[in-house]
Amino acid sequence: GDCAGIGGNHMIHAAKRNVDLTVIMMSNYIYGMTGGQRAPTTPYGAITKTSPLGNEEHPFDLFQLLKGAGATFYARCSVTHPVQLQNAIVEGIKHKGFSFIEVLSPCPTTAGRNIFNFKTPSEMYDWYESQVCMYKPDSIQSEDGKIALGVLYVDDTREELCEVQAEKKEAESK
């Protein structure tokens, strides 16, 4: 939540500028370390400390938000698929431009108990595993509503900000 909320303005402008930066955001649907407040990624209707009657706000679609802002690399991974996560991080770091890696990660204490009503961390882990599928280029969600994992978007055609600035500086010095 913090990256999408408090840090959201910085994230959007880094994507807009296509700064050569890799952001890895752990998405656990909640502000878990501060007591369980609603976050920008909290599911609609979820019960939290700050939405006791259910979250009346729809969560950000970070993929669409950042793609619209100008991000040139977007991957969504899960801690339930560590090899895919490792590969996405390597690919994101190698990518020239703004790379965003969303990592679905359980928060068994706050989100697990309060939002999803799980009794154990392993129950939440199993739920995460059941909610995901590998990305198919046609859709970011499968037909059965599962969340698509993988590299969802790459644009290698946009220039990276620092390269543009260096080119301008060099042209100016001639």
Give a label for each model feature.
Residues 36, 79-80, 104-106:
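Histidine- and/or cysteine-centered catalytic micro-motif in compact active-site loops
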Residues 14, 39-43, 117-120:
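Short, hinge-like loop/turn segments at secondary-structure boundaries
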Residues 22-27, 102-104, 152:
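Short beta-strand segments
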